Amino acid sequence: MNINLQFHSTGKRTELNFDETDKIELIKNSIRIMEGINPQEQKLIFDGKVLKDTSTLKSCGIKDGSTISVLFEKSSNFLK
C-alpha cells in the first residue's frame, strides 16, 4: 500500500510503498536512508497519535493513501 509522508520541517511530501504488516520502525529506517535522520530523532504521527516503533501499520489504522506526519527532534548530542 502507498503511504504519504509529510515532513513538517521542510514541507516535503513523499509517497512510499509498505505492507500493512510492516512496523513503524521500518518506516523510520526508510526515512533515515532518505533524509539521514536517526530513527531515535524521528516522531511519526497519525490521527493525532505518536506511533510506536513496534506497532504495525494495520494496528495503527493506517490504510492505502494515508498520510503520516514526520517530525524531527534534535537529540541531546546537538546541544553539546
UniProtKB/Swiss-Prot annotation:
GO CC, any one term: nucleus
Cited InterPro entries: Ubiquitin-like_dom, Ubiquitin-like_domsf, Ubiquitin_dom, Ubiquitin_ubiquitin-like
PROSITE patterns listed in its UniProt record: UBIQUITIN_2 (PS50053)
Protein species of origin: Dictyostelium discoideum
GO molecular function ontology, one term from the record: ubiquitin protein ligase binding
Name the UniProt record assigns to this protein: Ubiquitin-like protein NEDD8-like protein 2
Bridged cysteine pairs (disulfide): none
Family of the protein in this entry: Belongs to the ubiquitin family.
One GO term of the biological process aspect: modification-dependent protein catabolic process
Pfam short name (any one): ubiquitin
